[in-house]
Amino acid sequence: KKIILSLSIILLTFISNAQQTATLLYHWQDSTLVASTAHNNTYNECWGLEINSYEIAVIGSTAGTHFFDITDPFNSTEVAFVAGAYTGTGVIHRDYHDFEGYLYVVCDEGNTSTLQIIDITNLPDSVSTVYDSNALLTRSHNIYIDTTSAKMYSCGTNGTMQVYSLESPQNPILIYSYNTGVHDAYIINNIAYLNCGGNGLIIEDFTMVDTIGDQPTQLASFTSYPDAGYNHSGWLNENKTIYAMLDENHGYDVKLLDVSDLTNISVLSIFNSGVDPQSMAHNGIIKGDLLFISYYHDGLRVFDISDPLNPIQTWEYDTYPSNNYAGYKGAWGVYPNLPSGNIIVSDMQTGLY
């Protein structure tokens, strides 16, 4: 079956607490790219950039990494593409994070995959690959860069989480291997909120980890909570008091945690999209008082969490209209941090919105 892919940008204008459907601004299709054998997904993660006063959307596919100038959403255009070291129907995951004018790219499939570092400072005119090697890592599920400490955390690398110094952004240096399995992470000022699958949420302080042999300090372990499943991902609010935690299981709720005291973490509320008993959240990002979630089959879901005891769903956009809730389909990633307020959402089967 031919897969029709789309790239679109959604503009959200927040004017009330009533749930509203977001407005679609731009749509791009490419029917030439193949889908994965595993999940029939051609796209995976999305990311956003502001470079030289231009807004750029980054999209991962089975072919590689696509860059779009979306400064004027109605006239958006693809401006660059970097092929993956591993491509084709075996690709499911790619992941991205940027630091100091470079985009860091990983893939979780293929024995020929690499860490790619792409110079993005000349966008929207061009990009250039400055590093493409498996000397440090071959496969990685997720990466997160703590820009405050110039460290990159690579999750799911050889069964560990590896920590790299980015003091020289083009030449990462491995400084630590964390031997507990970590699926995803959020890190700021060396404090790492680690989503460890069946081992729940672990919080570690990596302040003293600068060379091989140094050890982090564990600050908390949170494993017993309502709807505890596969602890998949999470995001911290700006005040470092509220943490949104997502377990990747059909029918499991999103949790808001009080993390103001790491010796006494508590669940403030649990909630869901309200669409289907088998709905499943994937990734979330907190911006201000809003929690943006790529909610798999239910598309984009936005919650007002100004009262963390009573989150209110305010916006939605269904990127995957099918009512089949089996497997992994629909919205994969979300990026709400562009200066314009435009929101990027990637859908595994229908492209990027």
Short names for language-model regions:
Residues K1-T21:
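Bacterial Sec-dependent N-terminal signal peptides
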Residues A18-Y353:
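Feature marking well-ordered beta-strand scaffolds used for ligand recognition
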